[in-house]
Regions:
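Membrane-embedded alpha-helical bundles of polytopic integral membrane proteins
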Residues: 2-163, 167-199
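Juxtamembrane boundary at the C-terminal end of a transmembrane helix
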Residues: 251-266
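Hydrophobic transmembrane alpha-helices of multi-pass small-molecule transporters
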Residues: 19, 174-175, 236, 243, ...
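Hydrophobic alpha-helical membrane context
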Residues: 23, 60, 152, 220-223, ...
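Acidic (Asp/Glu-rich) catalytic motifs at the cytosolic membrane interface
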Residues: 43-53, 136-152, 164-165, 202-244
Length: 266
């Protein structure tokens, strides 16, 4: 009983600290600061992914991680750096027999998600990150309490504790709340922000499920222990990483569509 109370207390304290830190970083609104902090988080998440995929850590893995993250700071399209890092790792696997084929996986997850998260900030600013946070947090909170109150139907064998009703409530709540934040970012207004929030929330749900699947497959409860009461970095950011990729793609193609419309109009 005492252990459960201590864990619950640790969970709230850690959550409060994370909110304060995230708030200060977004308030500072400095690209270098955001890149540096997120890079450190990525390194921890990458180490956790090595454990999930049962890949042995090596110098070459972390060298590619560091070089690709540095390149992302200077590259106009950070996600490209994630894909290139995966291609470089695949080339090393093909050339040498030092690594198993699974060594490419951490560069895809969580790699692509972290680069997408950096891309959301770099390309679309702090408001887009706040939008993403609102969507993901609302989805998680709505799913938890919705499942507790109304949940009856199991959502998936991957995560037996989650219910279909909870997931739906979470997505609806995230879509509505997210749209109020996102509409200030989009010229299309409320309904386009609602659509983008819905698609991002949907991807966030599957990010959480994928992390649950990996942990179940690896036979572990948490991806790490760095966050008291929460587990590892990936335990906290699984939904965020999938949601970031979704939101970045949506916002990017919206920008391309606008530029194309202007070009054709001229």
């Amino acid at each position: 009983m005492k252990e459960e109370l201590f864990k619950e207390k640790s969970r709230y304290i850690t959550g409060f600290v994370l909110i304060i830190v995230a708030g200060l970083i977004l308030y500072a609104d400095n690209l270098l600061l955001f890149w540096a902090v997120l890079g450190g988080v990525y390194a921890v998440g990458f180490s956790e992914a090595l454990r999930l995929f049962q890949v042995k850590a090596s110098f070459s893995l972390y060298l590619i991680l560091v070089l690709s993250w540095v390149a992302a700071y200077f590259n106009g399209h950070p996600i490209e750096c994630a894909l290139i890092s995966a291609m470089v790792m695949a080339s090393i696997i093909a050339y040498q027999k030092e690594h198993h084929s699974e060594a490419i996986l951490p560069f895809l997850y969580p790699g692509v998600g972290f680069f997408a998260l950096f891309g959301v900030y770099k390309d679309f600013g702090a408001v887009a990150i706040i939008w993403l946070l609102v969507v993901v947090v609302a989805s998680d909170v709505g799913a938890f309490f919705g499942g507790k109150l109304l949940g009856k139907t199991p959502f998936t064998p991957t995560s037996p504790n989650k219910t279909l009703e909870g997931a739906l409530i979470g997505v609806v709540l995230a879509s509505v709340l997210g749209s109020f934040v996102g509409m200030g970012k989009l010229s299309g207004g409320f309904f386009m922000a609602l659509l983008f929030s819905f698609l991002t929330a949907l991807m966030a749900v599957f990010g959480d499920l994928y992390e649950s699947y990996l942990k179940r497959k690896a036979g572990i409860k948490d991806s790490g222990k760095i966050l008291p009461g929460h587990g590892g970095v990936l335990d906290r950011l699984d939904s965020m990483l999938f949601g970031a990729l979704s939101l970045h793609v949506l916002l990017y193609f919206l920008e391309v569509w606008k530029e194309t419309a202007v070009f054709l109009g001229d």
